[in-house]
Amino acid sequence: IHNLLQGEQQNMHSLIDDLAAVRALIQLYIDGSNGDTAKLEQAFHGDARMFGRIGDNPTGSGPIADFISYIGENPGNAGPNYLAYVRTIDLSGDAGVAVLVETDYLGHDFVDYFSVARIDGVWKITNKTYAEVGLTQPPS
C-alpha cells in the first residue's frame, strides 16, 4: 500500500507541475498578444492553427504564423480595460485544453480555447479556437 500511495503522490505532483506549466504557457500568450511576437512564437507550436470570427468575419482562420505576423505589425491590441483570466485547464497525459476569457481585446470580449500538447517534454499550444462573445462595454 505504501508504494501505491507513493505512486499516486508522484502522479499528483506531476499533474500539479503540468498545470503550472500550461498556466505559464497561456501567460506567454497573454503577454505576447499585445505585440511581443517572441513570446507568441515560444508559446505556439510551429504548425499550430487558429480559427475564429468576429461577427460575420472569419478574421482569424489559418496558420498561427499569420496571427503572429499580424500582432507584430499591429501591436497594442489590448484596450485600456484589458483583462485575461484562465478559466480552466484540463490535462490527460501529454494532451489537454485551456480556456482563456479576455475582455477589451480589439474592442471585443473573447473566450479562447487552446489545445495544448507536450512535445519533446515541452508544452505548446497546437490550436487556438476563439469565440467573440460581445463588444467591450466602456466603464460607467
What does each model-identified segment do?
Residues 1-46, 136, 140:
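Short, low-complexity N-terminal intrinsically disordered segments enriched in polar/charged residues
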Residues 40, 87-89, 115:
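Short secondary-structure boundary/capping segments
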Residues 77-78, 83-88, 124-125, 132-140:
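Low-complexity, flexible helical/coil segments
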Residues 17-21, 49-108:
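Surface-exposed, charged secondary-structure patches
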Residues 55-58, 62, 130-140:
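Short, charge- and proline-biased low-complexity linear segments
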Residues 33, 44-45, 102-104, 129-132:
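Short beta-strand segments enriched in hydrophobic/aromatic residues
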Residues 1, 109-137:
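Short beta-strand edge/turn micro-motifs at domain boundaries
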